[in-house]
């Protein structure tokens, strides 16, 4: 392979490659730039460490659950890469819409995983602090079990070392562990829906479907279900990647993820209805030992998901500012800088709901609905009546509407947050509550039944 000239600062990828020495047989998507995802994340001496299909499956499932359920959109993305002869999301958009599209996509592709890293830190700090508070003899006000210390400690001991890997294939086993812990969490949430749900007062109109804030919910779901930003990374880590193999992998990943996400959301809402918080574990009582174990599993899960997002942010920075080629020193420097900034921001923000909404409508929605559809519509020579084009014509305006209206509603009608507060139904003593909401709902509930015995 020939060595291409080094790109200048902020220039998009061109049709050349660095002499890295990495090759694979029969590529479905030809090489397009100096140092692409395969070369950055799977170096020459690591060529034999390509992931098998099962490891890639767990990487995709982990990305979806932690952080796309949009099956068609994911396959459309890889098809667009095949049509354009590109092998990264950025190079696909650059080939389709030129430099302006490349810059816009780079900003979105950086912001989404970066904000996701912030949200994962918030979850880890909130969740694990409650776990350590349950240790006998530990003062709840102890600074060493506070969310700030836990965020810093988990960053230094776990997320930073894992994020320093150059090969995304090495995260396959980590993603398997994360997926297994997610299954345990699902079991705990289901158990508490049965044992705790009947004792939680239901809010009025709890079962009214598609209220006006449904648009905000779509934004949150977009945040949760996206893995488009790292799809090419996982695709490139496959042995002998093909569109057919990718389609099978995505179908299987989506089935697993849909099952877990639907059951998790349904059981959580069945338990708490209108009291449900952005972080579901904020709803459970601190003296619930079973949920405490679930919190521990949940905290570990988001910590293990964190590196997947860091890989993408680092790759975007490498492409835009360093021509795609990060030396060992700059690899460490960029990783440390990104994680440091994300950690500092997460220390200042403690409400998860608004983070999920804004990241969903502003970043995830374009990455899922708008950009893949627009690229495919411009590149494909299929007739307009082709099924792929029809779906693309449907997805594009839906994504634009969700983005605009979701942002307006997230700003004008932000989600309430009760971070760090014990919910009213957690008090073990007899308790009479009259709750008046904005819609003048009044509920009076005797909560004497909610004593410690419920949580044993």
Swiss-Prot record:
Pfam families attached to this UniProt entry: Aa_trans
One GO CC term, this protein: membrane
MF GO annotations: L-amino acid transmembrane transporter activity
Family: Belongs to the amino acid/polyamine transporter 2 family.
Source organism: Macaca fascicularis
Glycosylation sites noted in the Swiss-Prot or TrEMBL record: 94, 325
Subcellular location: Membrane
Record-given protein name: Putative sodium-coupled neutral amino acid transporter 11
GO biological process, one term: sodium ion transport
Record's bilayer topology term: Multi-pass membrane protein
Upper classification of the organism: Eukaryota, Metazoa, Chordata, Craniata, Vertebrata
Stretches the record annotates as Disordered: 1-25
Role summary: Putative sodium-dependent amino acid/proton antiporter.
Keywords: Amino-acid transport, Glycoprotein, Ion transport, Membrane, Sodium, Sodium transport, Transmembrane, Transmembrane helix, Transport
InterPro entries: AA_transpt_TM
Domain of life the protein comes from: Eukaryota
Main localization of the protein described in the UniProt heading: membrane
Membrane-traversing stretches: 58-78, 98-118, 143-163, 171-191, 206-226, 252-272, 291-313, 329-349, 351-371, 390-410
């Amino acid at each position: 392979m020939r060595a291409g000239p080094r790109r200048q600062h902020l220039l998009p990828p061109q049709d050349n490659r660095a002499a890295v020495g990495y090759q694979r047989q029969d590529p479905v998507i030809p090489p397009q730039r100096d140092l692409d995802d395969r070369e950055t994340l799977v170096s020459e001496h690591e060529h034999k460490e390509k992931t098998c299909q099962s490891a890639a499956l767990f990487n995709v499932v982990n990305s979806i659950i932690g952080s796309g359920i949009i099956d068609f959109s994911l396959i459309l993305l890889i098809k667009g890469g095949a049509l354009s002869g590109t092998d990264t999301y950025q190079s696909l958009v650059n080939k389709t819409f030129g430099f302006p599209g490349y810059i816009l996509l780079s900003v979105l592709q950086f912001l989404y995983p970066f904000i996701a890293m912030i949200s994962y830190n918030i979850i880890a700090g909130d969740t694990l602090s409650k776990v350590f508070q349950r240790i006998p003899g530990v003062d709840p006000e102890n600074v060493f079990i506070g969310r700030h210390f836990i965020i810093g400690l988990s960053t230094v001991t776990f997320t930073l070392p894992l994020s320093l890997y150059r090969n995304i294939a090495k995260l396959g086993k980590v993603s398997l562990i994360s997926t297994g812990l997610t299954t345990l969490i699902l079991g705990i949430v289901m158990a508490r829906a049965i044992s705790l749900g009947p004792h939680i007062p239901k809010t009025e109109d709890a079962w009214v479907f598609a209220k006006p804030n449904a648009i905000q919910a779509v934004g949150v779901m977009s945040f949760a279900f996206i893995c488009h930003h790292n799809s090419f990374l996982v695709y490139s880590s496959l042995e002998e990647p093909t569109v057919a193999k990718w389609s099978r992998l995505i179908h299987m990943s989506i089935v697993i993820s849909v099952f877990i996400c639907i059951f998790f959301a349904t059981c959580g809402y069945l338990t708490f209805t209108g009291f449900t918080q952005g972080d579901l574990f904020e709803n459970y009582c601190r003296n619930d030992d079973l949920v405490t174990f679930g919190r521990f599993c949940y905290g570990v899960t988001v910590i293990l998901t964190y590196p997947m997002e860091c890989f993408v942010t680092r790759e975007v920075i490498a492409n835009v500012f360093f021509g795609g080629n990060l030396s060992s020193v700059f690899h460490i420097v960029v990783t440390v800088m990104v994680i440091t900034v994300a950690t500092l921001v997460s220390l200042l923000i403690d409400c998860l709901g608004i983070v999920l909404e804004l990241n969903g409508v502003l970043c995830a929605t374009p990455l899922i609905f708008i950009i893949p559809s627009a690229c495919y519509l411009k590149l494909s020579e299929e007739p307009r009546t082709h099924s792929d084009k029809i779906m693309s014509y449907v997805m594009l305006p839906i994504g634009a509407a969700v983005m605009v209206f979701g942002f307006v509603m997230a700003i004008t009608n932000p989600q309430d947050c009760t971070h760090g507060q014990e919910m009213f139904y957690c008090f073990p003593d007899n308790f009479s509550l009259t709750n008046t909401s904005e819609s003048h709902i009044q509920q009076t509930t005797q909560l004497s039944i909610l004593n410690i015995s419920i949580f044993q």
